[in-house]
Amino acid sequence: MLPALTDLAQFRDLLGAAPGPDAAARAGAEERNGQLTKPPGALGRLEDLAIWYAGWRGDARPRIEAPQVIVFAGNHGVTAQGVSAFPAEVTVQMVMNFEHGGAAINQLARAAGARMDVHALELDRPTQDFTQAPAMTGDELLAALQCGWAAVDPAADLLVVGEMGIGNTTPAAAIAHALFGGAAGDWTGRGTGVDDAGLANKTRVVAEGVALHTSRDGLEVLRCLGGREIAAMAGAIAAARQLRIPVILDGFICTAAAAALAAVAANALDHTVAGHQSAEGAHAVLLAKLGKAPLLSLGLRLGEGSGGALAINILKSAVACHSGMATFAEAGVSDG
């Protein structure tokens, strides 16, 4: 079990002192990969994924047996600005759908053999409208981080985090804009499907929020412009690092949460891979800024952890080949 988060300074220190991969396990995995019954590099990126996974799990011949998918839900005061095509009550309704097994992520988690958990964060108390005030107080940010931090099962061996929150592409765009600059329009997309006028309004809201909150510190950006579910995802990603659990990032909103961590500690995302590139236009740019090449690009724009869950079976396949294939010596095959 991880210690509870007591304050933001402690969280910042934990990010800075996070453990790295096991060098011996990684070296052992690289050596094993060179002995498997295939031409060098024939499995392409699957080989890299298996070696990366082995290093983080501290096992040169690992298995993936206990993946966990966590969906965090939150509501946003900035929806008062008309940034979403859907009303905020949909968040509550979708949480019920998750709990009853009726959402896309339920099916995808089940297909991947993953445990799925749902955490709703004070849905009856939205964050503040960030065009008027910081989205959260320091205590509220800490509570959201702690929710994610405590949600990770220490027995899990792979983690996907997802979200549900009407309007949450707006804070995600604001976080990306604050951290990486450019114009608000570079980071703002249609989300759940706003029209041209809605997109112009949403872009204005992002620009106003970033102009109002001038700090570019990762945790301050998360506090002033983020949301509870976005902060909870960040907390879960950080907890997984402490536990050496590899993480598959989902779409634009999840990646924005991850970017806030990377702004605090440069290597904070070394234990993560990008599950997919979503249809939200700025996601590709954000992934490039973080140096993450997506495993999939299927035009998804659902959220919920859906793209990350789809990528579980890619990572499972990579590890299965690495750990299950015979070596040339074992198979009695000449390696040339």
Curated annotation (Swiss-Prot):
Gene3D superfamilies: 1.10.1610.10, 3.40.50.10210. One of its GO terms (molecular function) is nicotinate-nucleotide-dimethylbenzimidazole phosphoribosyltransferase activity. Its EC number is 2.4.2.21. The keyword Glycosyltransferase applies. It holds the Pfam family DBI_PRT. Disulfide bonds: none annotated. This is Nicotinate-nucleotide--dimethylbenzimidazole phosphoribosyltransferase. The gene is cobT.
